[in-house]
Amino acid sequence: MFWGVTQVSAQKDSIYIEAKLSSDKKNLEVKQEIVYYNHSDKDLHTVKLLNWVSAYNRRGTSLVYRKLEDRNNDLHFAKADQLGKLLELDIKNSENETIPIAALSDENLFLPLKEALKPGESITLQLHYRMQLPDTKFTGYGTSGQAAVLKYFFIVPDHFDPDNISKRNYHDIEESVSFNTFWTVNFDIPVNSFVEGNLPQVQMNSFKGYLDSDPEFLISLSQYPSIKNNIDGSDIEVKFGYNLKPEEKQNLEFYLPLHLKFLKEKLGSLPESIFISDKFRAKEDFFGNNDITFWKFRFPLFTDAEKTDLDYFGIITKKILDESVIADKEKDHWFKNGLKSYLEIQYLKKFYQDTKLLGMLPETKIFGIKPLKLFHASKVKLLDRYGLAYQYIMLQNLDQKIDEHFPVLSNFNDMAISSFETGSLFNYSAEKMGEGPFNDIVKNYVTKNSGKRITPEEFLADLSAKNKSASYLSDFFKQKNRVDFKLRNIRKEDDSLQIKIAKNTSASIPVKLETETKEGEKKVYWIDTEENQRITNVSLPASDNIYKVTLNSGYIFPESNYRDNFLYAKGLFSNAKKIKLKLIKDIPNPEYNEIYISPRVRFNNTYDKFLLGVNLKNQSFFDQKFLYSVTPTYSTGTGKLTGSGAVSYSIMPAESIIRSLTFGVSGAYFHYDYGLAYRKGSIASTLNFRKNPRSTVSRSIGASYNYFERDLSPKMIANNDYSKYNLWSLGYGYSDSQMIHEKSLSLSTQGMEDFNKITAEGFYRWEFAPKQKLSLRLFAGYFLRNNTRNDLFDYGISRVSNYSFSYTLLGESASSGLLSQQFILADGGFKSFLPGTVNQWITSVNVDSSIWKIFHVYADAGVYKNKDLPAKFIWDSGIKVRIIPDFLEVYFPVQSSLGFEPSFKDYAKRIRYTLVLNLGSIINAARRGWY
């Protein structure tokens, strides 16, 4: 059956497969022969085979953990019949002797060899195995009942590990492992089914040929379309693993030849056929060109033809790179990703040079006007997307170095760093040296390494040899960078303009300088900077009538700060930046110092009622190191002026155990009771430790000093209440917001002249079934010293004392009525109205569990002790209804230390609720899984 396979190639592996798919498409039986060569330079005593279907076989595999990081728990909660697993496996050597394996569930099968396999020699392995295919909803591969998508299920050698010693688990990252192999695959499939794949089809259900990527097959009840193209006399067929709408197919028949011709000019050659699966299309399409839908309204950014063009250029580009370039994705992901983005940039320059990032959306009229025209975002070019994505993540200090191993790259950095930043740097080099020479280097490198595993450092070396100004790239890719070019000043000397450019790096990086006259005439100069020299002086003729000078316009280079790249040579703002007032938060325009002035209307509490005011701040959609915000308001409840203000500065070292160190000063003036105001002044510092952007773990240390002044009522004055007090606090916080086991811990100490206390709080939430959770909170508080005059600073049992004005309470001083029923999970955390406060120590536990849909049960128990009184045990229980989880929830007490509460006449007054109106919390919850 397998005769002649070894004759295909002297040094290339061969795999022969006969695969039979069951009628329900859930089981696959495979008879297989592998001719494996020792590609290392040493004797092999074991051969490793990848058994990646076992990545789907249980909880706890690397694949399950990665999916949970992506906020996807489908595989974790999968039923047994949805999992993938190896059911049987028999492996024999060329002497028909069975080779033992450790376990069918292992993703890496290490086979002991009877005799050492010398370098260059081959071994023939006979395999017979049967597997259960996983559900396609987990990774896009497996079975859906209607179709089977086969990729990474055949047992194959790992060509990136010629020594056969390192484990490589499946992470669903589209990595090639069985490249440079001759495949023969014959299928036995259910009746009325069709099979398509990325191997040349030699007859019905049979495929044969070389692949530098992994084989992929689609077996379904439908025969999907294909489009044949003739490019410079060569026929290229593009096959699809999904249906095309008539309009989409018509558009593709027009655009695919353009794409393929463009790519052939840049890369030199094209494969004879291209297979695009539904999963590949979804992964590699153009990010950010989808229509915006809101309720029943749909706002298109681009026409259907433009979307097809943009989507499929990226899809086709990446598919061709995957088929023609052999790269270890774990280590060298940036090469193909960067080339894809570079080629996209070249395509956009040619066909979408002036197209805006928001497409035709700014032309949308609402009540006869075009409101988006007021935003700078409406003027940003589509080409700017590459630099903007890097800016967005870098300014949060959540970027990663370009050559970071792919498994630890966050999903957003896969796009923003591996693809966009690398592509921008390639484009930067191409603009400096000329696109023709750069494209020749790319074409020659890809052609030279056809059929071989690439070493991208060699590409960078070739680039540096042809263009010395690109020599910085090798080091640049190995670290997080914060390069900043700055226009220091412009001065006129005789008949020339002297321009001083500063950089914050010793590397020799060129900079693009652009001049512009008042009439809009532009000139471009490339300035080479010297190594170890941070100041560069440029002299330009004064006769050029230069009005404005710009460095690296259009976010062409990944800088840490574009705000110092613009200067005016003439006028009132010469050697300075102009100020621009804006009404609504926007993508920042680095040419201006922007101040956002926006009206504010919000409900504060029952005393201030609605606050009417205006907010002045410099915070755009992107983070900044220096931030200020001032919000004067008019309190409709008191008829007085109120407000708040804050100033902060953050230090964000690129390579450090610290992610950010922020210092801030703030102040506020509002009301906490009828006719009673408070004034608060704060000095605070927060240190956030560095986090792996894929990780859900965050750690921080915070310290603050707060000064308070409160107006007092006559009764409070008579009771010698506190009108002025100072609070010092120091705390440590740890949180892990992973999907199944969420946990957090906080430790803090707080004090003033009359007391010192320490507090600890732990929280754990377990998702034991889809959307069903059990949470446990532990709280402990202890006064080291307590000489206070009243219970203001005591620990609360069922109500918190908001003496620091840090909780959002609708009725700050309410003791009855609906406002007093607001619940804040703090201190003791009891939901029933258990009387009293605690002035010595308290411990409590709060338990909450799902029972059905939005209904939960809760129980609280604890022990507390007040001075000169014995310790007391308290408890409560009840039903919680999660109307909007974590934001609006209602508590119905049932049984507690007080008795059976529904029997009380005032039961309606005992119902509690939480109401969280925090947009930041919503945003943080939404972005989980991206970074």
Regions found by a protein language model. Give the residues of each.
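Extended, low-hydrophobicity, Ser/Thr/Pro/Gly-biased non-transmembrane segments
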Residues: 71-89, 102, 107, 126-218
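Juxtacatalytic substrate-recognition/specificity segment
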Residues: 185, 225-347, 559
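Amphipathic alpha-helical substructures
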Residues: 271, 404-492
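Beta-strand-rich binding/interaction modules
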Residues: 196, 274-275, 437-438, 465, ...
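C-terminal outer-membrane beta-barrel translocator/porin domains of Gram-negative envelope proteins
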Residues: 660-673, 686, 712, 725-850
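Outer-membrane beta-barrel initiation region
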Residues: 511, 519, 523, 527-529, ...
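Acidic/His/Gly-enriched intrinsically disordered linker/tail segments
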Residues: 335-424
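Outer-membrane beta-barrel "beta-signal"
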Residues: 881, 885-887, 908-931
